[in-house]
Amino acid sequence: MAAVGRVGSFGSSPPGLASTYASGPLANELASGSGGPAAGDDEDGQNLWSCILSEVSTRSRSKLPTGKNVLLLGEDGAGKTSLIRRIQGIEEYKKGRGLEYLYLNVHDEDRDDQTRCNVWILDGDLYHKGLLKFSLDALSLRDTLVMLVVDMSKPWTALDSLQKWASVVREHVDKLKIPPEEMKEMEQKLIRDFQEYVEPGEDFPASPQRRTTGAQEDRGDSVVLPLGADTLTHNLGLPVLVVCTKCDAISVLEKEHDYRDEHFDFIQSHIRKFCLQYGAALIYTSVKENKNIDLVYKYIVQKLYGFPYKIPAVVVEKDAVFIPAGWDNDKKIGILHENFQTLKVEDNFEDIITKPPVRKFVHEKEIMAEDDQVFLMKLQSLLAKQPPTAAGRPVDASPRVPGGSPRTPNRSVSSNVASVSPIPAGSKKIDPNMKAGATSEGVLANFFNSLLSKKTGSPGGPGVGGSPGGGAAGASPSLPPSAKKSGQKPVLSDVHAELDRITRKPASVSPTTPTSPTEGEAS
C-alpha cells in the first residue's frame, strides 16, 4: 500500500502512470482541482484506484503466458530434433539421448512481448519412456501439446508408430492420477475446440485478444455439430499434432518401390482416421526442402498461445498436406477412396503397405596379392610333392604342331646325337622345377644317351654302320637326305625310322641284349 500511496501524489508518479493520466477526463478533473485532496470527494478517489487497478490487471493478462510445453515422440531417425532445430534456424547440432530439452522463442509483435516455449524430445527407444515424468506432470498437463512424428521415408512403419506412442502417452497420463473432474474438463475442452473450428476467412482481427472475444461471441450464436462415430474416440485431453517428416522421399518411393498415387492416398486416409480418433491435426513436412516448417511453428503458437493464423487446409499436394484439428471428417476422407483403382477401402494397412525386401549387395571379396617370393616358395613346395616322372618317358608339355615337334631344332638328328655326351640310362631324373621346354630337351637327351650306351656296351658287337663303337659316325651317312635340307625341321618319324633300321640288323646288335624299356616306348 506504500507504493499505492506514492501513486496518489502525482508529483512523484512513475513515468508510465504520469503518461497514462496526462490526458482524458480524469486528467481534466485533476487539473481543475476537483479530484484533489482538498475536494474531499471519496467517490472520485475510489474511481481513481479502480482505474489504476483495472489497467494493471489488463496489462498482466495481455502478457504471453509462460510454462507452455511441446512433447515430441517418435521412432529413432524420424527427424524430431532436426525439425525443431530447423524451426530454431540452427543448421549444425548434436542429437541428444534420453530426454532432450530445447525451446522456441515466441514473439508477439502486436503486444511487443516475447516468451519461451519448452520443447521436450523423448528418445525413440521405449526404454526411456520413464523419463516422461520430468516433462509431463500433473501441473504441466494443461499447458502441453503432444507432437507425434512419423518417418514418411518408411511409410510401412507409420501406423504402428502412431499407435505405439499414443498408447505411451495414454499410459503415462493414467499414471498421473488426475482427478476425474479435472480430466473430464480437459476432454470437454478438446471436444469443444474440435467442434467450434471455423475455416479461416479473409477478415481477421489484428489482436489475439479481440479475436478471442469475437470468437466467443460467435460461439454463443453458432450451432455446434455433433461428433462423428469415429471422432475423438481416444480423447487424451491434450491437443495432438501428427507431423510426417521426410516427405521428400515420396518421389523415391515412386521410383524405387513402384508406389502410385493411390498408395499415398491409402496411407493418408489411414493417418487421417487415426487423427480423427485423437482429435489431432496433420502436417506433412520436409526439412530437406524446408517445406511446411514454419507452418508447424504457427500451429504450435496458435494452439498454445491463441495466435491467429490464416492458413486453410491443404489436401491437394501429396507431399504438403495440412489438416487442422476440427476440419476433417469421414466424408472428406472418403474422397480419397474414390481414387482407388486396385486397392479397396477395407484392405488392411499392413497387407498393402509392406516393408520391401532387403536387397543384399554381393560384394566381391578383395584378393590381396602375395609377395612374389612367398608365392614361388609355395609353388616349389607343391611341385616337390608331385611324384617324379620316369627318366625314359618323353613328357612334352608344349602343344604339338601337326607334322613335327615344337622344340625340335633346325638340324639333323645325327648332330643331336653327336653333341650329347654318353650318360647311363636312368641315371638322370627330371627336375620338377624345370620348365616345359627344358624338360623336353632333357628327355630327348636321355633317350639318345640310352641308345649310345646300349650300342657301346654290347659284348663283341661291331659298331653300327661298320665303325666300332662309333654310333654317331655310322648313323650319320644313313640318315634320309630330306633331314639335311636347310629350312626343313626334322620330324619324329625320322627318329623312328632310324631306330627301326638299327633293330633290323642282326649282325650289328647282339641277340642277347635286352630291349630297353625306353626304346620300346619310343618305338
Curated annotation (Swiss-Prot):
Please give the residue ranges the record annotates as the region Disordered.
1-25, 200-219, 387-434, 457-523
Residues binding ATP are G74, E75, D76, G77, A78, G79, K80, T81
Main localisation: cytoplasm
Q: According to the UniProt entry, which residue ranges have a biased composition of type Gly residues?
A: 458-473
Where, per the database record, does this protein carry Phosphoserine? Answer: S207, S398, S405, S412, S419, S421, S427, S486, S510, S516
Question: GO terms for CC?
Answer: centrosome; cytoplasmic dynein complex; endocytic vesicle membrane; kinetochore; microtubule; recycling endosome membrane; spindle pole
Which spans does this entry mark as compositional bias, Low complexity? 412-421, 474-485, 506-523
Residues in a coiled coil are none
Keywords in alphabetical order: ATP-binding, Cell cycle, Cell division, Centromere, Chromosome, Cytoplasm, Cytoskeleton, Dynein, Endosome, Kinetochore, Membrane, Microtubule, Mitosis, Motor protein, Nucleotide-binding, Phosphoprotein, Transport
Q: Where is the secretion signal located?
A: none
Membership in a protein family: Belongs to the dynein light intermediate chain family.
Q: Name one GO biological process term.
A: regulation of vesicle-mediated transport
Q: Which InterPro entries does the annotation name? A: Dynein1_light_intermed_chain, Dynein_light_int_chain, P-loop_NTPase
List residues, modification Phosphothreonine. T213, T408, T512, T513, T515
UniProt gene name: Dync1li1
Question: Where does the record place it?
Answer: Cytoplasm; Chromosome, Centromere, Kinetochore; Cytoplasm, Cytoskeleton, Spindle pole; Recycling endosome membrane
* GO molecular function annotation: ATP binding; dynein heavy chain binding; GDP binding; microtubule motor activity; protein-macromolecule adaptor activity
Which superkingdom is the protein from?
A: Eukaryota
Q: Is Chloroplast included in the keywords of this UniProt record?
A: no
Give the record's subunit note. Answer: Homodimer. The cytoplasmic dynein 1 complex consists of two catalytic heavy chains (HCs) and a number of non-catalytic subunits presented by intermediate chains (ICs), light intermediate chains (LICs) and light chains (LCs); the composition seems to vary in respect to the IC, LIC and LC composition. The heavy chain homodimer serves as a scaffold for the probable homodimeric assembly of the respective non-catalytic subunits. The ICs and LICs bind directly to the HC dimer and the LCs assemble on the IC dimer. Self-associates.
Recorded protein name is Cytoplasmic dynein 1 light intermediate chain 1
Explain the purpose of this protein. Answer: Acts as one of several non-catalytic accessory components of the cytoplasmic dynein 1 complex that are thought to be involved in linking dynein to cargos and to adapter proteins that regulate dynein function. Cytoplasmic dynein 1 acts as a motor for the intracellular retrograde motility of vesicles and organelles along microtubules. May play a role in binding dynein to membranous organelles or chromosomes. Probably involved in the microtubule-dependent transport of pericentrin. Is required for progress through the spindle assembly checkpoint.
Post-translational modifications reported in the UniProt record: Phosphorylated during mitosis but not in interphase.
